[in-house]
């Protein structure tokens, strides 16, 4: 748990344990389980507390070897905005491969999927909409003909035009958009996929 210089944080150990338990419900049929290996450590550091992805070296200075290091911070600055979680795809940054950073505000949620989403990235899963964060800009075709080279590059995942809160119903979690792919076919994305933004 990262605190400010005075030891103040907005998250409790119980909230973190609940987040891990929620992530484990998604992993139940996969024979994987997230466990806390030791006592939860506290790091008092203002710069790390308000984490910016440009400050990655601060993470590595505090890492424990041979485990996944989870950092719970007050905020994550990412480009021109903020992120709920942050990690590295395998092979991109070996030095930081065993790190997940979580925004405290995205953790205190009874149906949070941010932690398991970030573990998905750790296991080399991409977003279901692919590389772009621009709405309706995925290059994957609805018919799946380019599924191995576009979108998330997983062929059993339907093409996703970047589903999010603005095009998913808060009542039934159904996609409400009317975007079409390059062939004019309507997207029918899976809103329950943890690697989507729904």
What feature does the model see in each segment?
Residues 5-11, 98-101, 198:
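Short, exposed beta-strand "edge-strand" segments with a Pro/Gly-rich flavor and a Y/T-containing core
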Residues 17, 27, 32, 48, ...:
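Generic detector of leucine side chains in alpha-helical contexts
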Residues 21-24, 53-60, 84-92, 168-185:
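Intrinsically disordered, low-complexity boundary segments flanking structured domains
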Residues 17-20, 24, 99, 113-116, ...:
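Extracytoplasmic/secreted envelope proteins and their assembly/folding machinery
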Residues 105-198:
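The catalytic-center signature of Zn2+-dependent metalloproteases
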Residues 57-135:
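Active-site-proximal segment of zinc-dependent metalloprotease catalytic domains
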Residues 1-68, 72-77:
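Propeptide-to-catalytic entry region of secreted or membrane-anchored zinc metalloproteases
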Residues 12-13, 61, 93-98, 148, ...:
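Glycine-rich, flexible loop segments associated with nucleotide phosphate handling
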């Amino acid at each position: 748990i990262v605190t400010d210089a005075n030891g103040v944080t907005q998250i409790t150990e119980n909230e973190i344990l609940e987040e891990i338990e929620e992530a484990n419900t998604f992993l139940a049929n996969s024979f994987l389980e997230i466990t806390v290996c030791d006592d939860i450590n506290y790091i008092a550091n203002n710069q790390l507390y308000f984490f910016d992805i440009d400050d990655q070296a601060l993470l590595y200075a505090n890492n424990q070897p041979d485990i996944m290091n989870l950092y719970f911070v007050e905020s994550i600055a990412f480009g021109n905005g903020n992120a709920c979680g942050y990690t590295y795809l395998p092979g991109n940054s070996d030095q930081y491969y065993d790190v997940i950073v979580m925004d405290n505000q995205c953790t205190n949620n009874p149906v949070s999927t941010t932690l398991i989403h970030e573990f998905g990235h750790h296991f080399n899963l991409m977003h279901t909409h692919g590389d772009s964060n621009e709405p309706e800009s995925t290059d994957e075709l609805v018919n799946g003909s380019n599924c191995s080279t576009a979108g998330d590059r997983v062929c059993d995942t339907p093409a996703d035009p970047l589903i999010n809160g603005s095009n998913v119903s808060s009542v039934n979690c159904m996609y409400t958009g009317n975007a079409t792919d390059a062939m004019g076919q309507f997207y029918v994305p899976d809103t329950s996929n943890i690697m989507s933004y729904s």
